[in-house]
Amino acid sequence: MAKSICIIGGSTSGWWTAGYWEKHMPDWDITIYDAPTIPALGVGESCLPQLKWWWESMGIEENQWMKKGNAVYKYGNYKEGWNTPDPEKDDPFVTRFWFNDDNIFDKMYADKSNWKNGSINKQIFYDEFDTPDKRADYAYHVCAESTAFIVKQTCQRTKVIEDEVTTLPNGYDLYIDCTGFSRKFVKDKTPMKLHYQHFVDSAWVNPVHTNEELDWDVTKSTARKYGWEFEISLRNRVGMGYVYSSRHVSDEHALDEFLNNQKQQGRVAIGEPRRYSWTPTVFQNPWSDNVVAIGSSAGFVDPLEATTLFMTQAGITQLVNTIKRGYRKESYNRVMRRIWNDGIRFILAHYQLSKRTDTQFWIDSKNVEMKKNMWDYYQKYTSSYQWIFPSGTWCQLGTYFNEFDFYAPKL
């Protein structure tokens, strides 16, 4: 007997759900409510390597969606200023995905000039977008809004209703809430215990023009006085944003700092800055009754380490797996809590391990006991099941912060 699903919200999470559902749940009737008047979030998204499999699972070729979405290859993450605000004393660090590859040293690039200034995309992948025989040793920088449109174009069975709804439409077996931070139809808003206080809750974002002298093939995250700043290079622009704590700095002061940083770097803005705010939270039970929250509807803590789109991807794939296997919603909620915990712990490490004390934000972000608990958590579970971030990524993070002694066995 065919079942029906109603997706409310035509955002990235909404269309990703529709596209994946068409491919993997062929017996279901699919309807999406896509209100054209509601703007999409995002200024440029950094992704995890798992996204490659995601596109392949929907039958969308890399050489198709990357060209349409102005995406570029991402080879890791560049961190700067997380240990000290003094550029003379700071030692910037690059974490690379190919540390997780068995043949890492056979694939090492000559030097930094290979991945700085967009040269890898130009030398290897610029024309063909061809990656034969490659493993998950790269990810992507994408325009999330463009990926939603690309998936929408591939959908053939999804009924589209261009309307904004205020109540759940009648007659569907399952509802997917993709309404973002508004979370209009989430039935159980009990927050998951984060076990710590997360301060960053706001962001100024503004795309800037590309610049071959400044653009990178890695996601650049630079710690600032009251949070951190990201740079995500696309083919047609660069996404920039300042993620900060509104408890420690005013919105106006944060904007001034953000614009000043852009000016000092020689960046030329496209349009006016936009401000976003949120309450760092994750819902304990994203699937309650017959409504499932997907994407930022299910939770949002911090855009650090490319977790935003991954959590959307995980929420959709785990939901399909749960239904196909005949599991109960409790199983889905339990799995999603674990996935969120993994991501949050890794994000937390950046603040807990930082040695910065130049502002109250960095002082408040520290908690020595939590730092020890974090490493205990890592030791306990890293060998028990697969993490979002593999051991190699944790080791690179420990190298940057010089914190291996926290989890090394004491003789």
Task: Identify the role of each PLM range.
Residues 2-3, 172:
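Local beta-strand N-terminus motif with an aromatic residue
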Residues 3-28:
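N-terminal Rossmann-like FAD-binding beta1-loop-alpha1 element of flavoenzymes
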Residues 22-43:
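Glycine-rich FAD pyrophosphate-binding loop
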Residues 39, 43-129:
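Dinucleotide-binding Rossmann-like beta1-alpha1 core, especially the glycine-rich loop
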Residues 136-254:
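Predominantly flavin-linked oxidoreductase catalytic cores and closely associated redox partners
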Residues 224-278, 299-310:
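Conserved FAD/dinucleotide-binding core of flavoprotein oxidoreductases
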Residues 270-333:
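A conserved active-site cap/scaffold subdomain adjacent to cofactor or substrate pockets
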Residues 321-411:
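Long, low-complexity C-terminal extensions of enzymes
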